[in-house]
Swiss-Prot record:
Name of the protein in its database record: Sphingoid long-chain bases kinase 2, mitochondrial
UniProt KW ATP-binding keyword: yes
Function: Involved in the production of sphingoid long-chain base (LCB). Is required for the cold-induced accumulation of phytosphingosine-phosphate, the regulation of the cold-responsive MPK6 and reduction of root growth at moderate low temperature.
Main location: mitochondrion
Species per Swiss-Prot/TrEMBL record: Arabidopsis thaliana (Mouse-ear cress)
Length: 364
């Protein structure tokens, strides 16, 4: 479903930006080429008419249907705030993976930005739409200076990615970010299985208990953020810590005994606000890996507050390291250790995780 509209000021927004996003440049009527790096270099592209072409990818089923209702309320604000500067296309997803296809088509058609409207799941699909067969999707005209930015209006069950940037779940603020038109370059993670089945993530990927909990949580999204608690309780039933083999940056294999969960963060939060990879910065060219070992159910109960406020790195049996790539295998080869990224179930180990520095520009 496609609705095209032209969509001026609503509510002033002056929130402080994270330090890793300070190198920015406003979108103007000029065209710029990007200058590489993962540190937040900024640039801008608009259509030949001088108006920005924005594609909003909306998941109407998000948050048990709440996304569709909130989006309908937001549309008048979009038209009011953005009318002088942009052309807006609204595209509603019809099912799983549809946002990926919509995004690829929009980029090939030369959109200046694709904005995910929904939760982390919708954002995850839109990010994957920026890539095809291991390469960035390009504008079909071959125009080297043309680059599509990623945007976000958080209206879903979970908005963990937005937390890293200090963004509230306020659609008015999101519209103001889009109106300002500032771009910053950020990293993206990519996951593969023996060189195949490439999958991209922008927030956090994880292995074993947390991934299993996320798998179960997805079945209870009608309960809102409570779904994460229900998923964790269900995942604990029959859970066993596992010995794993890990290789960092192509080096020697290391044995990690009794792994409870392994998390690979491009950003900081997952699971409805848990600051699991607190040192992750999505523009520094690295991923943060946090490993929890030999945790029992009561460890989570006693240390849950530390996991949420990001102080768990000082806890025994918790380690953290910065990597460009990490390969993870289970030693027993049971084929039953869950893998997920940005809350989406990807299957089971083995997997390789690596960073793509400065892979996407985000409206910030």
């Amino acid at each position: 479903m496609l609705r095209s509209t032209c969509c001026t000021p609503l509510c002033p927004f002056t929130a402080k930006q994270p330090s890793f996003l300070r190198k920015q440049q406003r979108i103007t009527s000029d065209r710029f080429t990007f200058r590489g790096g993962g540190g937040g270099d900024a640039a801008a592209v608009v259509s030949s008419s001088g108006l920005r072409d924005l594609v909003f990818v909306v998941n109407p089923q998000g948050a048990n249907g709440r996304t569709a209702k909130e989006w309908k309320k937001l549309l008048p604000h979009l038209r009011s705030r953005l009318g002088k500067d942009c052309n807006v296309s609204e595209l509603l997803t019809s099912g799983p993976s549809h946002a990926i296809d919509i995004t690829r088509e929009a980029i090939r058609d030369g959109a200046d930005a694709v904005i995910a409207v929904g939760g982390d799941g919708t954002l995850h699909e839109v990010v994957n739409g920026f890539f095809w067969e291991g390469k960035p999707v390009g504008y079909l005209s071959g125009e080297a200076s043309r680059s599509t930015a990623l945007g976000l209006i958080p209206l879903g069950t979970g908005s963990d990615f937005a937390r890293t940037f200090g963004w509230n779940n306020d659609p008015c603020e999101a519209v103001e970010r889009i109106a300002r038109g500032m771009r910053s370059r950020i990293d993206v993670g990519v996951i593969d299985k023996e060189g195949k089945d490439l999958h991209y993530f922008i927030n956090v990927a994880d292995v074993h208990l947390s991934a299993k909990a996320g798998f179960y949580a997805s079945k209870y999204k009608k309960f809102g953020n409570l779904c994460y608690v229900i998923g964790a309780l269900q995942a604990f039933m029959g859970h066993h810590n596992q010995d794993m083999r890990i290789r960092v940056n192509g080096g020697e294999w290391e044995i990690y005994p009794q792994v409870t969960a392994l998390c690979v963060g491009n950003a900081k939060y997952f699971g409805g606000g848990m600051k699991i990879t607190p040192n992750a910065i999505p523009g520094n060219g690295n991923l943060e890996v946090v490993v929890l070992q030999n945790f029992k159910w009561y460890d989570f109960v006693l240390k849950l507050h530390k996991l949420y406020n990001g102080t768990h790195l000082s806890v025994n049996n918790v380690t953290s390291r910065s990597v460009q790539s990490i390969e993870v295998e289970e030693i027993t080869d049971s084929g039953s250790i869950y893998v997920q990224s940005d809350g989406e179930h990807l299957g089971f180990l083995p997997r390789k995780f690596q960073v793509l520095p400065g892979a996407i520009d985000i409206i910030s």
